[in-house]
A protein has these predicted regions:
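Bacterial Sec-dependent N-terminal signal peptides
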Residues: 1-27
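Short glycine/proline- and aromatic-enriched beta-strand/turn motifs that initiate or cap beta-hairpins
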Residues: 22-77, 196-198
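Residues that define the transmembrane beta-barrel architecture of outer-membrane proteins
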Residues: 27-29, 65-71, 108-116, 130, ...
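Residues on the lipid-exposed face of transmembrane beta-strands in outer-membrane beta-barrel proteins
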Residues: 33-35, 69-77, 91, 116-122, ...
């Protein structure tokens, strides 16, 4: 948490420092809805559920990995035409249904994991409605594991793991509303596509 607050403080200082570089400050909020593909946090369900002890003892495993496509919601504040700071929420879910080899008893493991990030967006090229930028962020994912086993009572476990965003190659085609694409890696996947709206 201390690192995240430090990151936000640095981002705000950069906003103030770069403000004099922009003659046309927008000072507006942006809202973004996006879809990512296989985010950094999606490895945890594979290791925890897919390679878990219950799965090793089971047969007829039905493993559903919804977070191959991860939805995200973002809000950011344009300090000027170069710098924006904001926050991001992504949601992931994975589940596995299985039968035990010994007696055919059925169990289920599920994991829900929201991710919160603090982001810094840096525009490095603008031409009309087209822009290129980099997006960098720090945050954490909270993993909620729910085990339903026929051999013991229902269990719920919580774990938080640090996350990052590193998207150096990003494109936007809007002035007020439009499409964006981000390439890199982090909590939003290796590719993130979405729609941006000026508020």
């Amino acid at each position: 948490m201390k690192k995240i607050l430090t990151f936000l403080a640095i981002a705000l200082v950069l906003c103030v420092g770069f403000k004099s570089l922009s003659a046309q400050d927008t000072n507006r909020w942006d809202a973004r809805l996006g879809v990512g593909f296989f985010g950094l946090q999606d490895f945890i369900p594979i290791l925890t559920i897919g390679l878990g002890e219950d799965i090793d003892r089971a047969t007829n495993v039905d493993f559903r990995f919804l977070p191959l496509i991860t939805p995200s919601f973002e809000m950011s504040y344009e300090c000027n035409k170069y710098i924006s700071v904001g926050g991001q929420l992504t949601l992931g879910y994975a589940t596995a249904k299985y039968e035990y080899i010994d007696d055919g008893a059925r169990g289920r493991s599920s994991m829900i994991y929201p991710t919160l990030m603090a982001n810094l967006k840096v525009n490095y090229l603008k031409s009309g409605s087209f822009s290129m930028y980099g997006l960098f962020g720090l945050g954490a994912s909270t993993f909620i594991l729910i085990d339903n086993s026929p051999y013991y009572s229902k269990e719920m476990n919580f774990t938080a793991i640090p996350m990052f965003n590193f998207y150096p190659l990003c494109f936007s085609t809007n002035k007020d509303n439009g499409f964006y694409m981000e390439v890199g890696y982090g909590s939003k996947g290796w590719l993130n596509l979405g729609w941006e709206m000026k508020l």
